């Protein structure tokens, strides 16, 4: 059997409502030499049976069923089974835009890049706005990731040469930001990365999705991932240490914003620790948004606890 050119990996957990549209968005692509790996991660809503039905209707759709192990394990299962020269990741509640595969494949071939990425859209709102096609070489991709370039947030919305993935896998012990860390590890291999000025991915906001879940201690992975990135930069890219410190500082700031929304005193010691870290590292802050500047001011001028108190009052009043 001839190997497909592109392998599309879709982790699916209780996504029965969204899978038909997701699969149809792949089937509607201009480029038709693909395989679609549906990884049923122990679904309990009938998603597994639907994967089998979709496979029976289209031989390019390949279902795989496993016990629930999380999105990273599901994506890794897809990587182990893909046969394509190129790989894409697509979430089960999202869709590829028309022409996605053709645009990304053309960009890779025209530039000799290893990773191609494009814009995403949520309803009528378009994210990720490169003004025109751009190419990163060497450390530029690592620098872009540390600087929060919007095309480095996620594993989806991209086409990868299978060779650049190699033996890199999603970390199963990371539950938040696992896909940005996966992409960061690929960028540390210093591949050529091309960004295209085209909307190629539709991101759908699902209230029960992993990225929309209520606060839990898995969010501690936000600064854990930042620490992992910092260690890699310290070891392999010392010239980017300033950018890495700024990245880590922003992760601490982000974590404090999440903690401010948590009632009670359960995380008070962690809040104190992070406030000390932010104050000590504020000299490395690189201004990016007015909102970020204001939040840093709050955190470094003794205003965090008044902000927290006011937030909790407003939250209770709104119930």
Protein language model features and the residues they cover:
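Short, well-formed alpha-helical segments that are part of the catalytic scaffolds
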Residues: 14-28
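Short aromatic/hydrophobic "clamp" motif used to bind/position activated sugar donors
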Residues: 87
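Acidic helix N-cap motif at the loop->helix transition within catalytic regions
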Residues: 18-20, 45-54, 60, 95, ...
């Amino acid at each position: 059997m001839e190997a497909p050119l592109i392998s599309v990996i879709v982790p699916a957990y209780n996504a029965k409502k969204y899978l038909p549209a997701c699969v149809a968005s792949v089937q509607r692509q201009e480029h038709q030499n693909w395989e679609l790996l549906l990884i049923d991660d122990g679904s309990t809503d009938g998603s597994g049976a639907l994967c089998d039905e979709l496979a029976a209707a289209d031989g390019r759709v390949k279902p795989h069923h496993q016990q629930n192990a999380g999105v990273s394990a599901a994506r890794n299962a897809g990587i182990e089974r893909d046969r394509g020269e190129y790989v894409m990741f697509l979430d089960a509640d999202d869709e590829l835009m028309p022409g996605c595969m053709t645009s990304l494949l053309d960009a890779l071939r025209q530039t000799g890049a290893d990773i191609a990425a494009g814009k995403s859209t949520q309803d009528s709102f378009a994210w990720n706005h490169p003004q025109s096609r751009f190419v990163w070489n060497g450390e530029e991709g690592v620098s872009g990731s540390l600087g929060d370039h919007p095309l480095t947030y996620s594993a989806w919305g991209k086409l990868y040469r299978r060779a650049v993935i190699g033996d890199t896998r999603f970390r199963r012990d990371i539950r938040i930001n696992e896909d940005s860390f996966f992409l960061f590890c690929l960028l540390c291999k210093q591949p050529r990365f091309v960004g295209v000025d085209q909307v190629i991915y539709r991101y759908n906001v699902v209230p029960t999705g992993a990225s929309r879940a209520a606060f839990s201690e898995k969010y501690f992975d936000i600064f854990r991932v930042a620490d992992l990135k910092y260690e890699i930069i310290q070891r392999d890219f010392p010239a980017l240490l300033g950018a890495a410190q700024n990245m880590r500082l922003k992760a601490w700031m982000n974590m404090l914003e999440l903690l401010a929304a948590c009632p009670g005193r359960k995380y008070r010691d962690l809040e104190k620790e992070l406030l000390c870290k932010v104050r000590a590292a504020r000299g490395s802050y690189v201004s990016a948004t007015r909102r970020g500047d204001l939040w840093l001011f709050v955190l470094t001028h003794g205003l965090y606890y008044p902000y927290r108190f006011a937030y909790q009052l407003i939250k209770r009043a709104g119930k």
